[in-house]
Amino acid sequence: MAKTIVGALAPLVAARARASDGVVIVEETVGRGVEVLAGVDVVKVNYTVALASSKARVDSAKFFVFGVGAGEVVEGFDAIVGGDGATPPMRVGGARKAVVPAALAYGDRGAGCDKTGNACSIPPGEDLEFTVELLEVK
């Protein structure tokens, strides 16, 4: 279950410890456009992902398109955009920052690992920081 926090990213880290079972969201900008319907809508977003432990950016995309709730992205990314009951879905024009726990990202397997599994761009057990801007609901 996501927890919404209004304010800067600094309180997000402290709040993250209290919300260890879920995504912690900072609402940077509340959109005024169409609200996302999880399981129905396809969205276009700009996003960046960084390792929570080092702040090293590991991924980013502009105009990324995916079906919300369709299993196309990690569960935490879906919760940021589509909401989860405790946090409302995003609206077009909105922007959020969030910390996604490893269990709702890549878990114990990590991602971008070499064939030996020793070098991973996202190490196993790593929490991730997302910045997401909702551009369009298709």
Annotated model-derived regions:
Residues 3-138:
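Cross-family detector of peptidyl-prolyl cis-trans isomerase
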